[in-house]
């Protein structure tokens, strides 16, 4: 089992191992936690694929998980300094801060918007489209086959709530959208709480196996992995790292851009999707057709796996799809699957 997880502070030892034991899998199951920031869930799928290709295993579960609502605040060790001590937000420090430039990932997004001349209006329009696509997808039950209801325990003996669908896409107010203040750059800024992704809890997982194992276990595969590729660039340019990884993937697989039916590019910020569409000259009608992280949420260690899960269900038989996700530090992962 490979499970992506970014903010592991206060989770206890080996989060992937915990997921296996508490899920009731055999204690002999081999487990590894993967941290490639937002690409963690997708990298888990790629590592699983490599394990199958090398013959190390023949059945591997891969995915990602993040509970951002439970990430603690940090307090430095040592004596209490005169004047008090400062708590550090674990989400911001370990998940959302560019180590090299010492500022929030949103500042990197602003830098990309400026470089590529992507306006606030373009980002808002993209975000509104994402919310509308997700609402329409839920209406059409496009997510029905990939969602697992989760019982959420309640206090004081109250019965658990059965959590069956994403919440974020319902929380939008389109009338106030273009009036929201910019967050990271007050003057001439473009990124707002509306056109960026949100802080969320979530998990996604896939079972991967060799063709021989599928035959032996008498299971019918949903899709096959065609290829995968990583890419890296300057840390401040992380939003456009998918545009580094995707061409490598297409070259490696020998597949033309025009032959890709659907694209899933993670919406850490709306500018990420807009920028990569622009650089790669992708058809917007084929990108994030059911919305993405802006409208559904972005539990950082999980999102990369969710993109792959959704492609498995959204593609039609015989179609190929590409999922890509950028990550802090200037990286990105990409994967191609065929239904």
Located regions from the model:
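Condensing-enzyme catalytic core mediating Claisen C-C bond formation in acyl metabolism
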Residues: 174-238, 244, 309, 314-321, ...
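Flexible glycine-/small-residue-enriched beta->alpha junction loops
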Residues: 59-111
């Amino acid at each position: 089992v490979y499970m992506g997880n970014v903010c592991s502070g206060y989770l206890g030892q080996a989060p992937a191992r915990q997921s296996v034991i508490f899920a009731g899998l055999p204690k002999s199951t081999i487990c590894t936690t993967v941290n490639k920031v937002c690409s963690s869930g997708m990298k888990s799928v790629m590592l699983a694929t490599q394990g199958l290709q090398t013959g190390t295993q023949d059945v591997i579960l891969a995915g990602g998980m993040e509970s951002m609502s439970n990430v603690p605040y940090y307090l430095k060790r040592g004596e209490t300094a005169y004047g008090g001590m400062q708590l550090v937000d674990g989400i911001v420090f370990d998940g959302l801060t560019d180590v090299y430039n010492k500022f929030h990932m949103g500042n990197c997004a602003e830098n990309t918007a400026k470089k590529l001349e992507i306006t606030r209006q373009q980002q808002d329009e993209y975000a509104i489209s994402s919310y509308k696509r997700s609402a329409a997808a839920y209406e059409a039950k496009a997510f029905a086959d990939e969602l697992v209801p989760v019982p959420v325990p309640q206090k004081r003996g109250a019965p658990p709530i059965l959590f069956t669908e994403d919440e974020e896409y319902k929380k939008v107010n389109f009338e106030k959208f273009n009036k929201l203040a910019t967050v990271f750059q007050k003057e001439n800024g473009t990124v707002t709480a509306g056109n960026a992704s949100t802080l969320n809890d979530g998990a996604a997982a896939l079972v991967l196996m060799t063709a021989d194992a599928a035959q032996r276990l008498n299971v019918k595969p949903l899709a096959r992995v065609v290829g995968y590729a990583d890419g890296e660039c300057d840390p401040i340019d992380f939003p456009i790292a998918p545009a580094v990884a995707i061409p490598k993937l297409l070259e490696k697989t020998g597949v033309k851009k025009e032959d890709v039916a659907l694209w899933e590019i993670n919406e850490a910020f709306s500018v990420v999707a807009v920028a990569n569409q622009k650089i790669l000259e992708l058809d917007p009608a084929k990108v994030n057709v059911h919305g993405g992280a802006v409208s559904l949420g972005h539990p950082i260690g999980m999102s990369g796996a969710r993109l792959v899960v959704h492609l498995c269900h959204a593609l039609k038989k015989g179609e190929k799809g590409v999922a890509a996700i950028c990550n802090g530090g200037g990286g990105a992962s990409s994967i191609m699957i065929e239904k």
